[in-house]
Amino acid sequence: MELAEIEELMNKAVQATQRSFNTVRTGRANSSLLDRIQVEYYGVPTPLKALASLTTPDSSTLLIQPFDPSTLAAIERAIVASDLGLTPSNDGKVVRLTIPPLTEERRKELSKQVAKLAEEGRVSIRNIRRDGIDSVRKREKNGELSEDESKSLQDDIQKLTDRYIKKIDELLAEKEKELTTL
């Protein structure tokens, strides 16, 4: 494993954590809230975005306009079954989601959820570090690297790890601030 490859993998882990954070509801309407919603469409779980157009007419409303009106009920069921805690209303043409202001209790729940997502991101980065260091040690054992080169590469990998974990911590702080700001 080369250093550039390790850095790319760590960057992808940070991006995945960011995407996970985007699916956590903060009290403002945002179509990325619905990214994880899978709708049963002819027996196949299908991403909601593939079945409908999503718009945000104002800061507290999401409109879901299905391309096929027969999917309205399935879309509603998928939203109710999700962990978003939102109640959809259906007028026969569109599904309307009104995002209520977050209660203090719900904010705390979401903060815990976000902290868990951040920890998953950190674990992912640490696993990449472990794989990278194992690769360096293996190359040293095979005689491809000197002991000094190996130590230097391991230090570089640790610096990358620290940098990317710091990025996840910054994303976490930003998201928690977003959750606590009314």
Curated annotation (Swiss-Prot):
The keyword Protein biosynthesis applies. GO terms for molecular function: ribosomal large subunit binding. One of its GO terms (biological process) is translational termination. GO terms for cellular component: cytoplasm. Keywords: Cytoplasm, Protein biosynthesis. It comes from the Bacteria. Its main location: cytoplasm. It is found in: Cytoplasm. The keyword Cytoplasm applies. Gene3D superfamilies: 3.30.1360.40, Ribosome-recycling factor. PANTHER family: MITOCHONDRIAL RIBOSOME RECYCLING FACTOR PSEUDO 1 (PTHR20982:SF3), RIBOSOME RECYCLING FACTOR (PTHR20982). Responsible for the release of ribosomes from messenger RNA at the termination of protein biosynthesis. May increase the efficiency of translation by recycling ribosomes from one round of translation to another. Belongs to the RRF family. This is Ribosome-recycling factor. It comes from Synechococcus sp. (strain JA-2-3B'a(2-13)). The gene is frr.
